[in-house]
């Protein structure tokens, strides 16, 4: 891996963070097994803070030491560079932050698995969150990318989020986050720690039926038998990225250990031993061919994290 970053004025910034922050702190931690697609190099330092106080200490430390901070949720929708990630990679553990219920509002920790949010909702007799049943990753990551399906998205149910910075933490209304298709605007350096969902009382049995139908549809149309980060490109207005990638003859096309799925052409599957460079080669090829044939510039939905070579990113920029 590339040499670990060094913080200004500190011979070993990692030792300083280890000293200040309570929780799990791992040097040169492999990230591939912590992502859905099982690709990527190590983090200089991977931190899972023990509690909100430990997170506050971490955020102050990275600011004072000028160390980059990358937030990694459940590893879905993420491609980590083969060279890894410099600085600190932050993961919030499940159960991080106090949970609460007030009528139709649930407050849950950002580390909660997205696909299991319905369990908390149904236990409270609430519905309206059926779309999350098949979404991998964590609640915080789902909010950050406004994750969703054809039956709903996070902006439909999020009413407020708690943001932590080096200066403190507090709830902000969802309206201030500028939710849009597969994105939202988070303040620089802010970490989502808790999320307030506003749902509605309803028929839990009917909600379960809707979720099961959605799961069944995903199993039929998505490559869930191999590691994948989910949709690679966002759908352009009035069309579907998978249709376009298939139309230019790339469905099932392979580079190294990665392939465009022969089940759904907007999904890249790891056949075993894939590298980030393999995945990026597939993405560049698809974007180039679609642009040449249809005049459409596909936009990446997957989040690129870490130290990528400039040549690997050529052809992926707008």
UniProtKB/Swiss-Prot annotation:
It is found in: Cytoplasm. Its cofactor is FAD. Pfam families: FAD_binding_4 (PF01565), MurB_C (PF02873). The keyword NADP applies. GO terms for molecular function: FAD binding; UDP-N-acetylmuramate dehydrogenase activity. Its main location: cytoplasm. It catalyses: UDP-N-acetyl-alpha-D-muramate + NADP(+) = UDP-N-acetyl-3-O-(1-carboxyvinyl)-alpha-D-glucosamine + NADPH + H(+). The active site is at 182, 231 (proton donor), 301. The keyword Oxidoreductase applies. InterPro entries: FAD-bd_PCMH, FAD-bd_PCMH-like_sf, FAD-bd_PCMH_sub1, FAD-bd_PCMH_sub2, MurB, MurB_C, MurB_C_sf, Oxid_FAD_bind_N. It is an enzyme of class 1 (oxidoreductase). Residues 214-223 have a biased composition (Basic and acidic residues). Cell wall formation. NCBIfam families: murB, PRK13905.1. Belongs to the MurB family. This is UDP-N-acetylenolpyruvoylglucosamine reductase. The gene is murB.
């Amino acid at each position: 891996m590339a040499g670990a970053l060094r913080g200004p004025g500190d011979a070993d910034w990692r030792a300083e963070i280890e000293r200040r922050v309570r929780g799990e702190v791992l040097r040169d931690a492999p990230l591939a097994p912590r992502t859905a697609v099982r690709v990527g190099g190590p983090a200089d330092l991977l931190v899972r803070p023990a509690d909100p106080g430990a997170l506050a200490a971490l955020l102050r430390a990275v600011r004072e030491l000028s160390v980059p901070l990358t937030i990694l949720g459940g590893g879905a929708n993420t491609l980590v560079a083969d060279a890894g990630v410099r600085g600190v990679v932050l993961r919030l553990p499940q159960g991080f932050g106090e949970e609460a219920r007030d009528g139709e509002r649930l407050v849950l920790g950002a580390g909660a698995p997205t696909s299991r949010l319905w369990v908390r909702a149904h236990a409270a007799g609430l519905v309206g969150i059926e779309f999350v049943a098949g979404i991998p990753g964590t609640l915080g990551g789902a909010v950050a990318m406004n994750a969703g399906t054809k039956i709903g998205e996070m902006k439909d149910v999020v009413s407020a989020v708690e943001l932590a910075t080096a200066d403190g933490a507090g709830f902000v209304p969802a309206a201030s986050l500028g939710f849009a298709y597969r994105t939202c605007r988070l303040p620089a350096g802010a970490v989502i720690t808790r999320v307030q969902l506003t749902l509605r009382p309803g028929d839990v049995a009917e909600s379960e039926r809707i979720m099961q139908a959605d799961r069944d549809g995903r199993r039929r149309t998505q490559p869930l038998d191999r590691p994948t980060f989910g949709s690679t490109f966002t759908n352009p207005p009035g069309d579907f990225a998978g249709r376009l990638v298939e139309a230019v003859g790339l469905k099932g096309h392979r580079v190294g250990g990665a392939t465009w799925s022969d089940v759904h052409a907007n999904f890249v599957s790891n056949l075993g031993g894939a590298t980030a460079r393999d995945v990026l080669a597939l993405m560049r090829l698809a974007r180039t061919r679609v642009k040449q044939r249809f005049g459409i510039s596909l936009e990446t939905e997957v989040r690129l994290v870490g130290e990528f070579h400039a040549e690997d990113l050529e052809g992926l920029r707008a």
